[in-house]
Design a protein with these regions (language model features):
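C-terminal outer-membrane beta-barrel translocator/porin domains of Gram-negative envelope proteins
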Residues: 179-315
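Transmembrane beta-strand segments of outer-membrane beta-barrel domains in Gram-negative
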Residues: 80, 86-243, 335
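Outer-membrane beta-barrel initiation region
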Residues: 5-78, 85-89, 104, 150-158, ...
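Outer-membrane beta-barrel pore domains and translocons
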Residues: 21-23, 51-53, 78-82, 121, ...
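Outer-membrane beta-barrel "beta-signal"
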Residues: 120, 181, 353-359, 374-385
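Outer-membrane beta-barrel translocator/channel fold
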Residues: 50-121, 235-277, 287, 342, ...
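Outer-membrane beta-barrel biogenesis signature
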Residues: 5-14, 128-149, 310-320
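Transmembrane beta-strands of outer-membrane beta-barrel proteins
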Residues: 16, 44-48, 73-79, 153-157, ...
Length: 385
């Protein structure tokens, strides 16, 4: 049994959670997050989050997921805006693999990130039998090693606009307008808590500041995740999973330079980077950036038999069917060339632990990670991979 109490909350169509926390970057922050499911369509969802800090910083995030435009075309969007006062940024050589944390710039930043996603589902695997609702099954068959027979295969077109403005004229304002093409095969048995299968995504990106008088920069990214069930462990763990993730990226246009040594490169906030919510998790977002990167993650995920959350007042108002303990390690590095020997030399690392739980159908993760430079605590939604 995952729930220790007979008094369980029924999963609701909407839920809102206030929060209060303090970090060195943001200061003392207060905010609220909310999710609404089945808005206009049963498989669709809205998610929003906003916070304000005593440093006069703010973050706003709004997203809409999985709205069916046709029987095989889904639409999603994400809108992000943040004003970060006296925040750390790693500009220019400050973001190289050999750079030091002491070289960071503490400045005021204004960030924007807006994107639309049009996802076309190929008539293979579960889509062939169940249509687009097949991708929302809580459990899926992942026993076949071919996208024709198993999983969800999709092609996504993702227009995006991003910008970053920093104070004190440390760097010029940077803007990127572009488009991504993503080829995705999701062959996991579950998207919220996978125990077996795999997930592979190949992404091509291209962009420019204006698309008028500038050359177009381009990037290639490949990510592959694998999951292996270890079964239960006596009366301690109901479920054990080993999860592995591999990521690599390159910017082919990086060394395409003119006579004035102006090169066709993305702005720094769009460069291949490590650090943040998904890779090298003990480092701030964009800590390392450059032309190329390679990164490996390994996680040991445990679902304990002991589940006290359903019997705790206030908390048991929310639907909490499971919680998960996680130990993880990340290693990776960026480089100014795509060379496997270079990318596997002097790699950066992170180790950490996390508690994850499903709240009203959304996976929430709280994790602490430590690296050679710093330690970070974060709370975010969704599994990292």
């Amino acid at each position: 049994m995952l729930l220790a109490s007979n008094v369980t909350a029924k999963e609701k169509d909407s839920a809102f959670v206030p929060f209060l926390f303090s970090t060195e970057t943001l200061g003392l922050s207060v905010g609220v997050a909310g999710v609404a499911k089945g808005v206009w369509q049963p498989q669709a969802a809205l998610f929003g989050m906003g916070l304000y800090s005593d440093k006069d910083s703010y973050i706003g995030f709004l997203s809409a997921y999985n709205y069916a435009l046709t029987d095989r075309l889904l639409f999603s969007t994400q809108l992000y805006q943040a004003k970060l006062n006296q925040a750390p940024y790693y500009i220019g050589n400050q973001g190289n693999n050999g750079s030091s944390i002491e070289g960071k710039s503490i400045v005021d930043g204004f960030e924007e990130n807006y994107k639309l996603e049009f996802k076309f589902l190929l008539p293979w695997g579960v889509i062939k039998d169940d249509g687009y609702m097949g991708m929302f099954k809580p459990q899926r068959d992942s026993s076949f090693a071919s996208p024709i027979d198993s999983g969800v295969t999709s092609i996504s077109l993702i227009p995006f606009y991003t910008s970053r403005k920093l104070s004190k004229a440390i760097s010029s304002d940077e803007t990127a307008k572009g488009i991504r093409l993503a080829l995705d095969w999701d062959n996991r048995d579950s998207t919220r808590n996978p125990t077996k299968g795999s997930h592979t995504e190949l992404t091509f990106s291209m962009g420019s500041e204006s698309w008028a008088n500038e050359e177009i920069w381009n990037q290639i990214e490949l990510q592959n995740s694998q999951y292996f069930s270890l079964g239960s462990l006596g009366g301690i763990f109901e479920q054990q999973v080993l999860a592995f993730d591999f990521y690599t990226a390159d910017t082919p246009s990086w060394n395409r330079c003119d006579e004035s040594l102006t090169c066709v490169r993305p702005p720094e906030h769009e460069q291949v980077s490590l650090g943040g919510l998904y890779r090298l998790r003990s480092y701030t977002g964009g800590r390392y950036h450059g032309r190329s990167a390679i990164h490996y993650s390994a996680e040991y995920r445990m679902l304990p038999e002991w589940q006290p959350l359903g019997s705790i007042p206030v908390i048991n108002y929310y639907d909490l069917p499971w919680w998960q303990w996680v130990a993880f390690v990340d290693v990776g590095r960026v480089a100014e060339e795509y060379d496997l020997k270079t990318l596997h030399t002097d790699m950066q690392w992170s180790v950490g632990g996390a508690v994850r739980l499903q709240v009203e159908g959304v996976v929430v993760r709280a994790e602490v990670a430590k690296g050679s430079e710093e330690s970070l605590f974060r709370v975010m939604i969704n599994q990292p991979f």
